[in-house]
């Protein structure tokens, strides 16, 4: 049993990632680890485990530029893969794997003793690799296997703090009160020592200066360090003088430094001392003065106290300096105890500044000369600061002011016992060429005025004089041994030779990815040599050759300065999933934790455009897809969580992403690329979508807009408008996919085309729809509003409905996609109907006749739809006939030809496709002559009705047939299933159910108001129509029809001898009130016609009565206009006998009305009201109908009068259309009103400048009541106030004129 357990534990170890062992290898690859920026010792990390670790985690690490390998070495150190400097008291032992338990030596603290004692704890750490859980109750096979299944890299964690929840999932519970050996409780924080498989630390006696209540870890151990730190070889002798509560607090204050307490890596220890603790007040009690040049993290203080005789640290410094022209190396030999240390350069500003040395006169920009008693050189020369920039500035109050400090100044006379340092050097380089810039900027720390114990490291020079460069500032020590040397910081790796653009920094939403895959929000801080910075923004540019360039805008909160860092990676496109992009600068070479190295993927979030809602309720605010030449795609999504009000970034990497955009059913991708449109049918030029989301290509180019075109042969063409920032030009790219129609449907649905079932949008992002703009919105039963929608039909019968939906309650917008695999069957045609008009006198219309009575108005506003050919359906209407045939009429616009046409599609079994309930349908009889007389459009707007079942009737339409059959069509929404269906109910006796109350015998319907027309299947346009019911039960439908092909207008009349049975059979008197409701019309004078009515008398006289409101006077009056010969001017066609059900002949004539008073004795009744609402209507020819009226006369003649304005010729005419057989059953009655007028109006004083009508010869001395003057401006002129080219003045009762005369002025101008 024991052997089985050991064997099982051994096998489990093979599956886990192990920490590095410290076995030196003779591998020739050691040179690869030495060719980094800092030129680190190649032997330091040359271990077999180090190469195994890198090869496993970063397979391509050897291909990375040799100058940017520092992050890899830093991570190797952190993982314990490099040789360590072990103190003389430390013992390193290795426990054989065959033992089931070992004794682990750890530190524990005895409050009564100043030394640490050893505690032996049985553990299996070395067998099962417990990592940070070593020496805890969770160090067992069950917990480690559970963690390995869920978190592959869990052994890389150095602290348990913050991972309690993850541990609980694997039945591991550790509390702050735990008494587990190995847990150190301090300041309410828990820290756990990390032991590798080959490391067991022994006890070490603490110095007598160490507080007995503190566990200072290695801080209490005197040590010798010899490390390359920040580009310099530094030898350190540390006496253990930084063991204090302050040091512990400083290191524990950040996750970036907390782990250093338990590290065994000498490089991290030395770096923490030099760049953090020595600069922190009270961190090192034995240190007499603070360092002021290692970082800006701590507040500097000044003191004139000499260093104590106890030497905390002595160093031997070797400085390597490189520049673009060559390299120089200066070595200061060790002359113990007088030694120096050079601290790292800090790079953190976009505006260069030079070293500031305070003098007694506090002139920060001056050069200071300090005499000393020691002398090793008579003169020295400061090398100029490498600075080449047209934008860099040097803050300097005087060019070269000098201040001399007296020799009696407090300068250490025995510097051999002091700590000698180099004040931080600074450099700023900026080169600009060809629009591309590479910048590295920095600032320096400040040396306190009284810090006289610090002198500058000497740099040998052959010059006998001391000089100062014009763009550098030098601190010189006369007769001394040292000068300040300004050196260049390591420059960033070069970018590709042909960079494409300079990007605006992304605002908001910027993130960066750590090598662990974690995403860090913008404004997160990171540490470089323990200095703390913020990444304000960053952008990644990917080039076709696989190179990526990371641009970062970095802010230093301490100095309040900003700089730009540029990092390139020749293999960057391959590292978007997990591999980090190392940087050549110390900012990215984070020594604290490798995870602070910025990742390779940071995108500019697209602004504007459509948001999408995830099933979880989260909202995708923005997203971007980047495709790399190696087929990898990276989808970045900015996601907002409404419940937590937080935003996060999701990154999805797909190594085979490019294959998702081509056919999945074929063995080879069918995607073809070309720069010109393919010669497929129905190609056209589209208006590029405006607004919305932009995307960036790997080349750095930007896709400003794109559109997907689907053709009947299943081919899709993706057109992209691409902008190249480097050339500032735009081009069009066309991508063709012969199997494209098969890739847009992700769910095969068999529900009706009205189904509102959302389907996921393909992640490949191959389809972008232009949302229709403008028009009418629609409201769903849930209260949400459909802002826009688009339907795409594919050759394989699939239809995809895309809807842009706004939710008023959440103030959010989402996109719904509904796919119907059988969508084309809902609209497919079984026969094409004729578009040639048939004879208007046909007594038995067929579904192809132009005299159909069931015609739908084209929907106005609202949503357009795009056909696979690229044409746009502006509007459409479905007509249902009694024989079950349905006719779909579509008004289609062709952008390429800029023309509009009407398409008609019939379905012989159309009524069956919409009926889901069998209610004993009765086919309407075909024995009668006319088609159905009444069909209602689906009601628009947001009004709905709720059924007892809870379902909602969104809209409904009733069709009444002449055989008394009615068909009710209802569009019903089911909230529980979130689907919509159509119900059809047929009633063979439906017409009888409506006879309930008597109504007036004479019923006249107003012409449809507004400017909307309706198109017949033949392509002809119904400009207006009216239904009249007579006392003999006959109903007459009159339609004013325009034929675009012949450019003529005619009147169609359809009568139904039994039409009145559905409404009324009781005779009532005829009294016409002013028409109410609807929209008013405004006259050119600015007056408003509230209502109007036209009366026709048997003596042929017509009288127009208008109720007019004057806004300026706030009064209302009645205007009456008569025409004594009105009826005669309209009847000119051939008279024929007409019975109900037949259509009479029509003629069109144009006459000029004569306005004469009438004899009241001749008045008869039959009054048609002018249409209420609307202003003017435009004919297909471009002419404008200013006003019109339909009149029915006792002789059965009907007359349509239209006042038509032609903008092209700037003239007005009257068109009269008559039908001699319009009606012969009209009843008459005596009128109740007599209207007469005998007054006249004097001539108007008109300004005829820039007018075409009237001419001076046309102006009369007087006008009769009702006469009009048409005042028309010349081309490009309009009236000064009315802002239109036409005004009509009419003679009123009492001799006054309607309207105020105005003068014509040039369009767009007005005169005061």
Curated annotation (Swiss-Prot):
Biased composition annotated in UniProt, kind: Basic and acidic residues: 565-574, 645-659, 813-825
Residues in Sushi domain copies: 1239-1306
UniProt entry keywords in alphabetical sequence: Disulfide bond, Secreted, Signal, Sushi
The keyword Isomerase appears for this protein: no
Disulfide bonds: 1241-1291, 1273-1304
CDD domains assigned: CCP
Major localization class: secreted
Annotated signal sequence range: 1-20
Comp. bias regions, Low complexity: 299-344, 365-503, 576-609, 660-692, 826-864, 914-942, 1063-1076, 1130-1154
Disordered: region residues: 299-503, 565-609, 645-692, 749-775, 812-864, 899-942, 1048-1079, 1114-1165
Keyword Glycoprotein: no
Compositionally biased region (Polar residues): 345-357, 899-908, 1048-1057, 1114-1123, 1155-1164
PANTHER family the record matches: PROTEIN CBG04714 (PTHR40289), SUSHI DOMAIN-CONTAINING PROTEIN (PTHR40289:SF1)
Protein name as catalogued: Uncharacterized protein F26C11.3
Lineage of producing organism: Eukaryota, Metazoa, Ecdysozoa, Nematoda, Chromadorea
């Amino acid at each position: 049993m024991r052997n089985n357990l050991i064997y099982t534990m051994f096998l489990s170890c093979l599956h886990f990632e192990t920490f590095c062992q410290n076995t030196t290898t003779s591998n020739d690859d050691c040179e690869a680890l030495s060719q980094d920026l800092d030129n680190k010792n190649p032997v330091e990390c040359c271990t077999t485990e180090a190469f195994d670790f890198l090869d496993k985690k970063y397979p391509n690490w050897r291909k990375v530029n040799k100058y940017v390998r520092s992050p890899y070495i830093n991570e190797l150190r952190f993982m314990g893969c490099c040789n360590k400097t072990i103190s003389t008291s430390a013992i390193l032992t290795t426990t054989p794997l065959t033992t089931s338990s070992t004794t682990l030596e750890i530190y524990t603290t005895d409050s009564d003793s100043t030394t640490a004692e050893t505690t032996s704890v049985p553990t299996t750490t070395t067998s099962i690799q417990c990592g940070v859980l070593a020496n805890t109750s969770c160090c067992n096979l069950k917990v480690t296997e559970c963690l390995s299944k869920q978190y592959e890299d869990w052994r890389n964690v150095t602290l348990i703090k913050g991972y309690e929840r993850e541990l609980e999932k694997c039945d591991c519970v550790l509390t702050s009160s735990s008494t587990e050996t190995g847990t150190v409780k301090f300041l309410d924080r828990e820290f756990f020592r990390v032991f590798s498989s080959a490391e067991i630390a022994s006890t070490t006696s603490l110095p007598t200066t160490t507080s007995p209540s503190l566990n200072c870890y290695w801080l209490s151990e005197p040590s010798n360090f010899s490390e390359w730190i920040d580009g310099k070889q530094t030898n350190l002798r540390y006496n253990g003088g930084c063991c204090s509560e302050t040091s512990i607090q400083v290191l524990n204050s950040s996750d970036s430094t907390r782990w250093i307490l338990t590290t065994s890596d000498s490089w991290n220890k030395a770096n923490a001392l030099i760049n953090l603790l020595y600069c922190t007040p009270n961190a090192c009690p034995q240190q007499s003065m603070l360092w002021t040049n290692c970082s800006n993290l701590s507040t500097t203080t000044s003191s004139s106290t000499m260093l104590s005789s106890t030497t905390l640290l002595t160093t031997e410094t070797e400085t390597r300096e490189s520049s673009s022209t060559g390299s120089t190396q200066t070595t200061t030999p060790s002359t113990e105890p007088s030694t120096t240390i050079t601290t790292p350069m800090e790079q953190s500003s976009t505006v260069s500044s030079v070293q500031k040395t305070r003098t007694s006169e506090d002139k920060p920009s001056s050069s200071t000369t300090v005499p000393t008693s020691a002398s090793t050189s008579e003169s020295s020369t400061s090398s100029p600061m490498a600075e080449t920039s047209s934008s860099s500035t040097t803050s300097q109050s005087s060019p070269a002011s000098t201040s001399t400090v007296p020799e009696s100044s407090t300068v250490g006379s025995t510097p051999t016992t002091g700590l000698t340092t180099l004040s931080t050097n600074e450099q700023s380089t900026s080169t600009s060429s060809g629009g591309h810039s590479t910048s590295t900027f920095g600032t320096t720390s400040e040396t306190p005025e009284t810090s006289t114990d610090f002198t500058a490291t000497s740099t040998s020079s052959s010059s006998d004089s001391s000089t100062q460069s014009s763009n550098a500032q030098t601190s010189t020590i006369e007769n001394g041994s040292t000068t300040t040397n300004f050196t260049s910081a390591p420059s960033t790796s070069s970018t590709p030779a042909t960079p494409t653009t300079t990007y605006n920094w992304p605002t908001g939403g910027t993130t960066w990815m750590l090598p662990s895959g974690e995403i860090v929000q913008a404004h997160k801080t990171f540490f470089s040599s323990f200095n703390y910075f913020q990444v304000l923004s960053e952008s990644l540019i990917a080039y076709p050759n696989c190179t990526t360039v990371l641009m970062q805008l970095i802010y230093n909160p301490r100095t309040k300065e900003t700089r730009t860092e540029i990092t390139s990676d020749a293999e960057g496109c391959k590292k978007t999933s997990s591999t980090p992009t190392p940087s050549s600068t110390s900012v990215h070479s984070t020594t604290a934790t490798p995870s602070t190295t910025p990742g390779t993927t940071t995108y500019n979030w697209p602004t504007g455009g459509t948001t999408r809602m995830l099933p979880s309720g989260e909202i995708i605010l923005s997203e971007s897809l980047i495709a790399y030449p190696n087929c990898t795609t990276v989808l970045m999504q900015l996601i907002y969580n409404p419940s937590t009000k937080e935003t996060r970034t999701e990154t999805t990497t797909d190594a085979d992403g490019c294959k998702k955009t081509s056919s999945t059913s074929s063995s080879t991708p069918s995607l073809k690329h070309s720069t010109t449109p393919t010669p497929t049918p129905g190609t056209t030029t589209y208006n590029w979508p405006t607004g919305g989301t932009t995307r960036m290509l790997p080349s750095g180019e930007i896709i400003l807009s794109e559109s997907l075109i689907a053709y009947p042969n299943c081919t899709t063409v993706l057109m992209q408008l691409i902008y190249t920032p480097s050339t500032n030009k735009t081009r069009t790219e066309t991508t063709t996919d012969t199997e494209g129609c098969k890739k847009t449907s992700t769910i095969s649905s068999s529900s009706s085309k009205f189904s509102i079932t959302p389907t996921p949008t393909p992640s490949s992002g191959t389809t972008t729809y232009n949302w229709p703009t403008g028009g009418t919105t629609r409201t769903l039963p849930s209260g949400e509003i459909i802002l826009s929608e688009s339907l795409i039909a594919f050759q394989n019968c699939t239809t995809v409905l895309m809807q842009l939906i706004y939710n008023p309650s959440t103030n959010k917008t989402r996109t719904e996609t509904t796919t119907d695999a059988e969508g084309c069957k809902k609209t497919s045609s079984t026969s094409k109907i004729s578009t040639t008009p048939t004879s208007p006198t046909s007594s038995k219309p067929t579904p192809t006749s132009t005299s159909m009575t069931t015609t739908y108005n084209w929907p106005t506003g609202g949503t357009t739809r795009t056909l696979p050919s690229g044409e746009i359906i502006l509007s459409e209407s479905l007509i249902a006939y009694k024989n079950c045939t349905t006719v779909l009429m579509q008004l289609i616009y062709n952008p390429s030809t800029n023309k509009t046409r009407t398409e008609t599609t019939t379905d012989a079994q159309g009524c069956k496709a919409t009926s889901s309930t069998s209610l004993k349908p009765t086919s309407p009889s075909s024995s009668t002559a006319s088609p159905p007389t009444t069909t209602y459009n689906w009601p628009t707007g947001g009004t709905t009705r709720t059924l007892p079942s809870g379902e909602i009737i969104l809209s409904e339409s009733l069709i009444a047939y002449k055989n008394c059959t009615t068909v009710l069509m209802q569009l019903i929404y089911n909230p529980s299933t979130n689907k919509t269906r159509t119900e059809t109910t047929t009633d063979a006796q439906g017409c009888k159910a409506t006879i309930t109350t008597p109504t007036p015998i004479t019923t006249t319907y107003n012409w449809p108001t507004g400017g909307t027309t309706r198109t017949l299947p033949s392509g002809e346009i119904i400009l207006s129509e009216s239904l009249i019911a007579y006392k003999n039960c006959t109903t007459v439908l009159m339609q004013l029809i325009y034929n675009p092909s012949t450019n003529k207008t005619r009147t169609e009349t359809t009568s139904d001898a039994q039409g009145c049975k559905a409404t009324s059979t009781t005779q009532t008197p005829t009294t016409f009130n002013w028409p109410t409701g609807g929209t008013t019309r405004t006259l050119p004078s600015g007056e408003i016609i509230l209502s109007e009515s036209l009366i026709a008398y048997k003596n042929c006289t017509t009288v127009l009565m208008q109720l007019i409101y004057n806004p300026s006077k706030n009064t209302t009056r009645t205007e009456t206009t008569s025409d004594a010969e009105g009826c005669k001017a309209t009847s000119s066609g051939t008279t024929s006998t007409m019975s109900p059900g037949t259509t009479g002949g029509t003629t069109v004539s144009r006459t000029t009305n004569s306005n004469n008073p009438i004899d009241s004795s001749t008045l008869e009744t039959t009054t048609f009201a002018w249409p209420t609402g609307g202003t003017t209507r435009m004919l297909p020819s471009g002419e404008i109908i200013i006003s019109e009226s339909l009149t029915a006369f006792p002789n059965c003649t009907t007359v349509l009068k239209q006042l038509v304005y032609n903008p092209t010729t700037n003239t007005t005419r009257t068109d009269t259309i008559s039908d001699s057989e319009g009606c012969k059953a009209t009843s008459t009655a005596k009128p109740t009103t007599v209207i007469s007028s005998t007054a006249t109006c004097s001539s108007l004083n008109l300004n005829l400048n820039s007018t075409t009508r009237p001419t001076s010869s046309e102006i009369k001395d007087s006008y009769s009541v009702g006469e009009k003057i048409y005042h028309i401006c010349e081309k490009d002129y309009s009236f000064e106030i009315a802002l239109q080219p036409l005004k009509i003045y009419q003679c009123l009762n009492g001799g006054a004129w309607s309207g105020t005369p105005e003068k014509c002025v040039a369009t767009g101008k007005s005169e005061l």
